[in-house]
């Protein structure tokens, strides 16, 4: 698959889940798809334990979709976004496979990662 087709699939899934959950910051989520895709395709590897921290926690849906795309979370789990009693909350939760640190307010990620 090409990068363009991958990012289109990811954006489509973000829009579908935003609509179904009746929540999420659409612009914030769509604006970081390219960045997340490049980082996960080229730098983050499961075996090497390279880690990524998303400080922009309100853009969690794009992060969850990327984690799904790269096999960290299942389609079934992804569909629980925005539902009651789910790990996939509207801000990043460290309880989600592939997530290192819970974030919400802008700027939390930088001091934690240092």
Q: Where in the sequence are the language-model features?
A:
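Cofactor-binding active-site loop characterized by glycine-rich and histidine/acidic residues
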Residues: 14, 20, 24, 29-114
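N-terminal hydrophobic or amphipathic helices/low-complexity stretches enriched
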Residues: 1-10
């Amino acid at each position: 698959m090409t990068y363009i087709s991958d990012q289109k699939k990811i954006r489509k899934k973000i829009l579908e889940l935003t609509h179904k959950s009746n929540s999420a910051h659409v612009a914030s989520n769509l604006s970081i798809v390219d960045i997340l895709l490049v980082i996960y395709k080229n730098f983050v590897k499961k075996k090497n334990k390279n880690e990524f921290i998303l400080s922009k926690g309100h853009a969690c849906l794009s992060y969850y979709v990327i984690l799904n795309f790269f096999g960290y979370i299942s389609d079934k789990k992804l569909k629980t976004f925005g539902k009651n009693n789910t790990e996939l909350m509207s801000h990043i939760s460290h309880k989600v496979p592939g997530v290192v640190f819970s974030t919400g307010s802008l700027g939390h990620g930088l001091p934690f990662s240092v």
